[in-house]
Amino acid sequence: PTSTLNILHGENGSGKTSILESIHLLASGRSFRSRNLEPLINSDKDEAVVFARLLDGKEIGLSKSRRQKHNLKFRSEKQSSWENVARELPCQILDSNSFLLLEGGPKSRRHFLDWGVFHVEHSFVENWRRTKKSIANRNHLLKHRSPDLSQIAAWDSELCLAAKEVHRAREEYFQVFLPLFLDLYRKMNGVDVDALIIEYERGWDADRELEDVLLESRGIDVRYGATQSGPHRADLSFKIGRNRAVDILSRGQQKILVSTMKIAQGLLLSQALDRKCIFLVDDLP
């Protein structure tokens, strides 16, 4: 071990990935291998416990039992969410699933973008929660056989206010992130940087206000029982010329692209907050 690098080595099944998973679980409340946390508890135990002491002396503890919800503590105080811990322990995972950033659906790319925004703009969390609440209530109304249009209109207004702030924060972050990434990508010997086009798509028509889009698409939304436009539909597009980057790049080139994006995100966090990002690298293929 050194001050900046730790290498875990051992036989297959010796627990190397489990250590990385414990750090990631403590930092985010999620496993990078499974949506279900139950397998993290040893078969002969009723509870899993993870504890960490940071360099500045702050302590983080997490326990998860089979019969109860998790119990998260930061500086000896119980936490109702991971917000404080996530800010204190920023982690990026690089593993075989990292390719989902290119190959997967928009959700993985939104998560990537929002991870960065979360760490540099504290108001983002509250605006995103407002957005989620508005969409959930709007969708609930849309599923009714005879939707109350006045209530839908009220949630439209709330959604548009929150969505405006979410979009602003994402766009501002992306404009700072992109040149930093491209500069690093050149140094990583990727494909011709000038041929690579990465764009942020906000989730509704770029030339129209969300209010107008929601009003016009209300009939479609009622038919599907879900809101079709908004920040929950945002995405990042990767192209080489006119083609999707994932269809052009080799597996090795995709690895360089995805790894560089995550490293660039960590560098941007360090520049903005003077805090180091923890990179967990697990058996890249």
Residue ranges and their predicted role:
Residues 282-284:
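Walker B catalytic acidic pair
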Residues 99-190, 201:
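An accessory alpha-helical subdomain
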Residues 24-108, 114-124, 175-183, 196, ...:
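Nucleotide-state sensing region of NTPase/ATPase domains
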Residues 16:
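Conserved lysine of the Walker
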Residues 45, 49-52, 139, 143, ...:
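Alpha-helix boundary/capping detector
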